[in-house]
Amino acid sequence: GGFKVGYPHIKTNMYNLEKHIDTIKEFNVSISGSLDLPLFLHDEYRVTKGNQKTLERILKNVELLKNIPNKKKVSATIFKEHYEHIEEIIKDIKFLHKNTCLDMNDFNFMIGFDYNSNGILHHMSEEEQVTFYKRMHQEFDGSDLDTGVNGPWFDEFGPEYCTNCDNCGEKFFLLEKNGDIYSCVRGQKNPDYYYGNIYNDSVEDILTNARNKIFLNHNREPLNEECVKCDYLYLCKTGCPFVKNAYGTNKSYTCRLQQELYKDRGYQKDQYNDEFVYEYVKKMRLENKEEYI
């Protein structure tokens, strides 16, 4: 009996990968590395503390992944500065797929938001996000990367991810080695997303705290009436509370991109949206649910 234990997985910038490659092989670790696309911007934005470029070393380390027994993949976060070089991004995806051990079907895009970029990078508008999404489909639909562009590349914006929860505090947790528990990598070190410490607090208190904090974070802004009228609310749940509060907004920052993806992937609009809105408000909102009957 007991729990099934999975193999370890690490997220890494791949800079010091060569130091750990034997351990990675020994313990069958799967790897998710981060790269900037287009690659020439990696050297601009990902430098060492001593201002040294890192791309050449990272591409060498990608080659070391060839012989690891478990999965390896990379992801790229796209800001406006990357979006402005969309054709270069396409070229570099093809380059990585053809010339490295990476299968670029197993790759994912994230859409950057300004919170963590120290003012260096800027977020794309919703129109630019949709243009980016459509350009990737135009280029890769029907190609040897069709599986990727219609699957993992944009999966983060589908309902399989964390934002599909009514309350993500009921399901997702980030544990630090000192025992501190936060919501996730976005909420890490932010007191509004701190749930407690496993050495000092009971499990019950941590779970209650998690649920309550996410509820409060969703309610910092009033419920968006566009969301109330949207038949995809059952999939989106108004988006990530952390990002909404970072932007001072009350709807998902990738709203239009999500709607494109829902249509392309055949998700049905909810014909009983009014009933869903009532149940959602009852569970997740401070607004009077009676107004939504």
Question: What are these model-derived regions, one by one?
Answer:
Residues 184-185:
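Short linear motifs in exposed loops
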Residues 188-293:
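Flexible mid-to-C-terminal extensions adjoining Fe-S/redox cofactors in radical SAM and related proteins
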